[in-house]
Regions:
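Helix C-cap/helix->beta junction micro-motif
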Residues: 3-7, 59-62, 137
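Glycine-rich phosphate-binding active-site loops on the catalytic face of alpha/beta enzymes
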Residues: 33-46, 83-104
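A polyampholytic, Gly/Pro-enriched intrinsically disordered region
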Residues: 30-35, 112-113
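Conserved small/polar residues in nucleotide/adenosyl-binding loops
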Residues: 1-4, 98
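Catalytic beta/alpha-barrel core
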Residues: 8-19, 34-46, 66-68
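Generic recognition of short, well-ordered alpha-helical segments
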Residues: 22-23, 47-50
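Catalytic cores of alpha/beta
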Residues: 16-31, 55-67, 71-90, 106
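C-terminal helical cap(s) of enzyme catalytic domains, especially alpha/beta-barrels
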Residues: 49-58, 78-83, 97-137
Length: 137
């Protein structure tokens, strides 16, 4: 890895499956990586609060710890006092029902675990609510 110019580099959630998160964080710092996007090695970041707190403390500001997975205004409100995490990654999504009229049961045109009749959209109100919480930190 050779860093080029002023480009900011984020280590994405592959971090969440590493064997030793503290050692991996130290390696990321030594490589000049700016940010680690993580859920604290759990499915959602609120469940990973203990590791997120440890990462923030042990990083001592040398790298940004960015919480992701399950982030919304209420999660930020709960997570910040527990962890000190100040950077968050979120979709701000809202699920809306498809306007498709005919729905054929038993046939899936995509991935079986995803609904054919739901659409995920970024919702401006969810983003505004999260921004408001962040401004109050």
């Amino acid at each position: 890895y050779k860093r080029q110019g002023d480009m900011s580099v984020t280590l994405h959630r592959a971090f969440d499956v590493c064997v030793d998160p503290i050692e991996t964080m130290e390696q990321a710092i030594s490589l000049g990586i700016n940010t680690i996007l993580t859920s604290g090695q759990r499915n959602v970041c609120l469940q990973g609060a203990d590791l997120l707190k440890e990462l923030v403390e042990k990083s001592q500001g040398r790298i940004t710890i960015q919480a992701g997975s399950g982030v919304g205004a209420e999660v930020i409100r709960q997570l910040y006092p527990l962890t000190g995490v100040r950077a968050y990654h979120m979709t701000g999504k809202r699920v809306i029902d498809s306007e498709m009229q005919f729905r054929k049961d038993g046939v899936n045109m995509g991935l079986p675990m995803l609904s054919e009749y739901e659409i995920w959209r970024t919702d401006v109100d969810n983003i505004r609510a999260a921004k408001k919480v962040l401004e109050e930190l």
